[in-house]
Amino acid sequence: MVCLPKQMRFVLLALIVLASCAAAAAQANDTQTAHTGHSLNELIDKRRVVLVVFRSRVVDVGENRERAIIEDVLKADPKPKGRFRWVYNTMARKLNKYMDKYGSLTAAEGLADAEYVIYFNVVEFRRILDTVYPYGELFVIIKGSPEQLKPPRIVWRANKVRYAGDAIGDLIKDLKTVRGES
């Protein structure tokens, strides 16, 4: 057995702890990236988008959850109602700034005209310092094409429940990265 001074033991122990923390963080980051399903590369050549905001009735947490969400979104009315109109306007303002600046997106008239759908599922409204903030999940759904036998699918989702403005900001940041816009 090798005898090490107390200071060397402490340094060696600190290095082992740091190495294990770094490995755990890298593994957590890999699972988080895999969970969010980033494949925005499919959106590079698609321009027409529609924004849909409503509270989903889907409570299934199994594999059928994505299919149920897609069915709800594709049957939904894209015009928001009630409190959701305010959430829609908050998100649309940020999307419109992106559209005006880069010109890589255009607003579709309805679901029939859109190539993909940006869907915000309102989970809750939080009241902080007498101000209401909408929180929810953001999804990007490609409508698919029956000619090529490609079903509608979720190609991107926020990795957690977020404030509406932050969620759309994350999507815009990822779109800029994928499309090479800066």
List each language-model region with its residue ranges:
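Short, flexible helical or helix-coil boundary motifs
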Residues: 19, 145-147, 179
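Intrinsic disorder/low-complexity segments
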Residues: 21-22, 26, 160
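A structural "domain/chain start" motif
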Residues: 25-97, 179-182
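Short, amphipathic alpha-helical "lid/cap" segments that border enzyme active or binding sites
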Residues: 164-176
